[in-house]
Amino acid sequence: MSMLREVGIDEAGRGPVIGSLFVAGVLNFEGLEALGVRDSKRLSPKRREQLAKLIEDATEVQVVELTAREIDERRKSQTMNEITVDLFARIIGLLHPDRVYVDAADVNPERFAYNIRKRCNSNMHNIEIIAEFKADVNYPVVSAASIVAKVHRDRSIRELAAEIGTEIGSGYPADPRTIQFLKRLLNDHKDKNSIPAYVRRSWKTVERLCHKAYLYTHD
């Protein structure tokens, strides 16, 4: 009798105004819970890096990335929830699970699970999808996916800052370092469409800063 393939899926980077969105899927394995992956948000960045390597060495892991430019293009016809559903379904298609645990990115977890299933290939419509709030705390396999996704995003932000050659903060709108960087960046550009591709131009934060800087914006 074959072992049930259980997969946890989570994302990192839905809300930032800078950088990519990452979604990770992790296949459950014996010994995962013993690694201490629960409540990943309380882990230090160094510990997350260590755990991500242990997880990626121990089991099947898939990570998909959607760049800021791709997010802007998709948002012309999709909501962020719909985009997230598509990426979660893509992970399912890569890992072929029997049961999936996901951190609900919708106010209605049942609807989120239904929409993911609907976006899966027809031969995967019968898989069990369990969507819950705080699944990254309640299920170690989702905690593991959260760790992997966050490590990939953090690494991407570090690489971007090194490439630009300046401090950009975390990329989140609530980070004063990120806002200061965006203000300096917007002063160097004549209109919104000339802003570098690593900035999510469709974000309200950018619209607001453009308006304050008296920049010409257009669709």
Set out the residue ranges of the language-model regions.
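RNase H-like, Mg2+-dependent phosphodiesterase core
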Residues: 1-219
